């Protein structure tokens, strides 16, 4: 296919996608060998429902999309809810995640997606925004009133204000279209690491010096309860799951306090102060909550007994 100057003038982005050689050469070069696949250039509007993948899978050649190491994910057969109205993209993503061992439930509109989320517990939701009927943002708000399942929004609306709107509605991640499968895998793996702790039995969460009690929403050190509030417990559990990693305030507000972050809101700082004080009372010295300037908070484990 030849890129028309008029298409470039309209500001349409040009994406590279893997297509059969029969789509036509981009320039007058010798014809490729039969059954050979090569890169060709394709023009599509920013909001086009097709072409969301920067690279389309080739039967028998999918190893080029699965070269990311996924062995660190500890959740066996993660349960994924995919809500996407584009049939071709929905089919490609369904096949891709099934090859990775996911159990996938697919829906073509927001209403059916909401019904599926109410029937079954999922580890991750991939959600398109521009859906027929109930749109993705409305579906996201409904999910957040009932559950804290990680949700990744997928949309051709990639402007800053669109991303901010998605995060303020409760999204855990926002992936603009077009995207590559490699980036999609990396982002889904990161979200699944956040739910890893919830899938472990209490006996496997034991620290040799600190015990997390999910039922009491408290921690015990040497048999002494710290007397944490539910918000303080969620904050410590989240920091402990991501020990050594600086977590941003917007993420902690959404994950722990279940509300959006504003610069004038000091609620998280108050919880951190109270948490430090309560841990000190029960002599927890091997965990330190550090403030990282311009980023958020970090949990550091030391060698103190």
From Swiss-Prot:
SUPFAM superfamilies given for it? C-terminal effector domain of the bipartite response regulators (SSF46894), CheY-like (SSF52172)
Q: Which residues carry this modification: 4-aspartylphosphate?
A: 128
Q: Which PROSITE patterns match?
A: OMPR_PHOB, RESPONSE_REGULATORY
Q: Which residues form the Response regulatory domain?
A: 79-192
Which Gene3D superfamilies does the record associate with it?
A: 3.40.50.2300, 6.10.250.690, Winged helix-like DNA-binding domain superfamily/Winged helix DNA-binding domain
Q: Which InterPro entries match?
A: CheY-like_superfamily, OmpR/PhoB-type_DNA-bd, Sig_transdc_resp-reg_C-effctor, Sig_transdc_resp-reg_receiver, WalR-like, WH-like_DNA-bd_sf
Query: Biological process (GO) annotations?
Result: phosphorelay signal transduction system; regulation of DNA-templated transcription
Q: Where in the cell is it found?
A: Cytoplasm
Regions recorded as binding DNA: 200-301
Give the signal sequence positions: none
Q: Which UniProt keywords apply?
A: Cytoplasm, DNA-binding, Phosphoprotein, Transcription, Transcription regulation, Two-component regulatory system
Modifications the protein undergoes after translation, according to the UniProt entry: Phosphorylated by PfeS.
Q: Where is it found, in Gene Ontology cellular component terms? A: cytosol; protein-DNA complex
The entry lists its GO molecular-function terms as: phosphorelay response regulator activity; transcription cis-regulatory region binding
Q: What is its main location?
A: cytoplasm
- One Pfam entry for this protein is Response_reg
Q: What is the documented function of this protein? A: Member of the two-component regulatory system PfeR/PfeS. Activates expression of the ferric enterobactin receptor.
Its recorded name reads Transcriptional activator protein PfeR
**Organism per entry:** Pseudomonas aeruginosa (strain ATCC 15692 / DSM 22644 / CIP 104116 / JCM 14847 / LMG 12228 / 1C / PRS 101 / PAO1)
Q: Which gene encodes it?
A: pfeR
